[in-house]
Regions:
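Alpha/beta-hydrolase-fold serine-hydrolase catalytic core, especially in secreted/extracellular enzymes
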Residues: 1-81, 234, 255, 261-263, ...
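Alpha/beta-hydrolase
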Residues: 99-102, 137-139, 221, 457-458, ...
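Conserved alpha/beta-hydrolase
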Residues: 124-144, 545-562
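A conserved short beta-strand
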Residues: 214-224, 229, 630-643
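Short glycine-enriched nucleophile-adjacent loop
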Residues: 175, 202-212, 597-600, 619-630
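Gly/Ser-rich "nucleophile elbow"/oxyanion-hole loop immediately N-terminal to the catalytic nucleophile
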Residues: 90-93, 153-198, 215, 489, ...
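Short, solvent-exposed loop/turn and secondary-structure capping segments
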Residues: 84, 95, 108-113, 139, ...
């Protein structure tokens, strides 16, 4: 089902890409909006201040035909960009200039990084020997100061999504500032600037050419394909985060490429490139060609396909050289010189000692500003304005990947049985096409008129032997000790993840839960079965003392829809969601909303007060579900993370608000009880409640046991 889901979502994005552009007038009306969206998705909105570059040449290397200046500049204070500037000798007038963006070519020896500019020196040398100035940049990750591109790829930094951060934005910004630097050089003709690079550098060539019209011609090499290749064919697994935007507006890559039009653009690739497959490259080219045709500039768009794999070869280099000769020089001579390397890595090194004030290694923590901590609103009107702004921004920036229209639920009862005085039911429903989920209900057999529903949203964090990570027994019936809580009595222990829930429930209902056991495997041992039976008996006994319907839902990727358990595969599944302008967490919020909607379609359940319950990430997902789904009476939130820095990732959420502000909004709509959570950091919700005169029971906090 997951494969089909990704196919369907990718197809929707592909179909919408540039679909509204029918005429040149359409394009002109949309172009600047698109460009501003791209700035935003590259973490560049608002655009950083253009501070003093503090450019410095640290040395020179001489060749008989050109000079190489070893230089650095600061694109932001402390964000150093190391580069080599190739200058032809005996220039008579300002020359056409190429910004060359380096790909992933590490040059590291004896613990010293010389920068990936060294790996691409032959390109700079060719351009300089043929009358061009060429500035070759190091990248953030593989420069002389080593930064990071692999936040979600291998470092588990999912908060990058919540920040709206991508290292592609740093590379784009460094390129913009590189053009600023080139404009300060008397040798450079600023009206004849071109951009190229291959692999990662090909991607950065796309960013700078799309964002900055100072680039008059571009020739990205092996740096683009479409979402179908990335998401459906799995190409994403071979790429780090510098290749991707934060896809807030759900673009396909042709939309980036179209922003270069009508300027000269050459798309270059090979026919056997496994990380930029040819079919996706050509689909991208076909969509971009339409935009060039609208401009009557079809001859400004070219495509070159060379033979072979993902490799820097003459078959790709020569067409690029010719492209710039034609469009920056107005000539097309025979290419007689090959691109060759002349220097050792040590020759091109900029820094003998790295600067102490560099922020390169941690720029991901500061590049995108987060939302400022809000003040408590002075009155109801101010609060409503703030609340409505937050909700609108969340829907637009964080949850745009939700379906725009409600698909059919297709609710069907799977089973309904009674054992040991407990009625246990299950209903299948569709959260989205290709996302089937199952809703479970349990209550005492004799219950006729329930007074509440407690819907527990299970997470994927497995424990062993039905024990919590704190050693407490897992339990299925919970609630605070308040009289109006959804379950009577003090909370006992920690409610389980799906596998623990299954172990408990199948002690009484093994036949009904056969599919679930097959889905997750790993049956329990005798000792665990005995313990699970004891947990079920406590659950059964609790149901006899109240009128609560206990309900359970496992969102996508958990329970029946469990995916490949391999940790690396789980990472790449999450990154696929990310590329589609979603996150796994944000779509689990949607699943929770759909579970509530499904409940309302079950006979007799429409008007029963419904509470949501969850812990850790599921607790935050429930919190946001309550902001967008009407009719939720209350929230029981356990071990609630205080920030999306450590909690679930939703695109851009930290640019809008953080968890405490979401708690305040939820508390206006329903009762919110935060349990087993550090008491510090929740003062905003309490202050809003007090200032606006809400009922004292709207927001309650029970700190961690033993906390002072």
């Amino acid at each position: 089902m997951l494969v089909e889901y990704f196919k369907n979502e990718t197809a929707k994005v592909a179909q919408s890409c540039l679909a509204e552009i029918k005429t040149l007038e359409d394009w002109k009306n949309h172009r600047e909006k698109y460009r501003q969206q791209l700035f935003e998705m590259l973490s560049l909105s608002p655009l950083p201040e253009k501070t003093d570059l503090k450019a410095m040449v640290t040395g020179k290397v001489e060749h008989e035909a050109f000079t190489v200046e070893k230089l650095h500049f600061q694109s932001l204070p402390g964000l150093y960009v190391t580069a080599n500037l190739y200058l032809p000798k005996e220039l008579q007038k300002p020359a056409p200039t190429i910004l060359y963006l380096s790909g992933h070519g590490p040059v590291i020896s004896n613990g010293i990084s010389y920068g990936n500019k060294v790996a691409y020196q032959h390109h700079g040398a060719w351009f300089a020997r043929n009358g061009y100035i060429c500035l070759i940049l190091d990248t953030l990750q593989l420069g002389e100061i080593l930064g990071l591109h692999h936040g979600t790829h291998r470092e588990g930094m999912w908060w990058w999504n919540s920040r709206g951060y991508t290292p592609a934005g740093v590379e784009a910004w460094n390129s913009i500032r590189a053009l600023d630097y080139l404009e300060t050089r008397a040798e450079v003709d600023p009206k004849r600037l071109g951009a190229t690079g291959r692999s990662g550098g090909g991607a950065y060539s796309w960013w700078i050419a799309a964002l900055d019209e100072r680039i008059k011609a571009a020739a990205p090499v092996a740096g683009i394909t479409d979402l179908h290749n990335h998401v459906v064919d799995g190409v994403v697994e071979g790429h780090c985060d510098c290749m991707f935007t934060v896809n807030t507006y759900r673009w396909d890559y042709a939309q980036v490429a179209a922003l270069v039009a009508p300027r000269p653009l050459l798309i270059v690739n090979t026919d056997n490139d496994t990380i930029f497959p040819l079919d996706g490259v050509m689909r991208t080219h076909d969509k971009v060609r339409h935009i060039y045709q609208l401009h009557r500039a079809a001859t400004n768009l070219g495509v070159v396909i060379g033979p072979g794999p993902h490799k820097d070869t003459q078959d790709l280099q020569v067409p690029v050289f010719r492209w710039f000769n034609r469009h920056l020089k107005g000539e097309d001579p025979i290419i007689e010189t090959a691109a060759v390397k002349f220097f050792q890595p040590e020759d091109l090194r900029v820094f003998n000692t790295l600067p102490d004030d560099s922020v390169n290694t941690n720029i991901h923590a500061t590049f995108v500003p987060t939302a400022k901590r809000p003040s408590v609103p002075p009155d109801q009107q101010a609060w409503q304005q703030q609340r409505d702004t937050w909700l609108s921004l969340l829907r637009e920036k964080s949850f745009a990947g939700w379906p725009s229209e409600l698909p059919p639920l297709d609710l069907k009862q799977k089973f309904s049985v009674v054992r040991n005085g407990v009625r246990f039911q299950a209903y299948d429903f569709s959260s989205q096409p290709n996302v089937p989920l199952r809703l479970y209900l349990a209550h005492r057999e004799s219950l006729k008129k329930p007074d509440r529903i407690l819907l527990s949203v299970m997470d994927a964090t497995g424990q062993s032997s039905s024990r919590s990570r704190t050693g407490k027994d897992a339990t299925l019936a919970q609630g605070s000790s308040k009289e109006n809580s959804p379950a009577s009595g003090d909370r006992q222990g920690s409610f389980p993840a799906f596998e623990e829930w299954l172990a408990i429930m199948e002690t009484a209902f093994p036949k009904e839960l056969t599919e679930e056991r097959m889905a997750i495997g790993a049956s329990t041992n005798q000792s665990e079965r005995v313990h699970s039976a004891q947990c079920f008996e406590r659950f059964r006994a609790s149901l006899q003392t109240n009128k609560t319907i206990m309900a359970f839902i496992a969102p996508r990727g958990i329970g029946l829809t469990t995916w490949n358990p391999d940790a690396r595969k789980q990472v790449q599944i999450r990154r696929r969601f990310m590329l589609l302008g979603q996150t796994l967490a944000s779509m689990r919020v949607w699943d929770t909303r759909r579970a509530v909607q499904a409940f309302r379609e079950i006979k007799g359940m429409k008007d029963v007060p419904l509470w949501l319950q969850g812990q850790r990430e599921a607790a935050i997902n429930n919190l946001y579900a309550a902001l967008f789904e009407p009719g939720i009476a209350g929230l029981e939130l356990y071990q609630l993370p205080k920030s999306h820095e450590t909690g679930p990732d939703y695109l851009n959420v930290l640019r809008v608000l953080d968890v405490p502000q979401a708690v305040a909004m939820a508390a206006e709509r329903c009762s919110v009880r935060i349990q087993d959570t550090d008491e510090h950091g929740w003062d905003f919700a309490a202050a809003v409640e007090t200032k606006l005169g809400w009922k004292e029971s709207q927001f309650e906090l029970s700190p961690l046991a033993g906390a002072k």
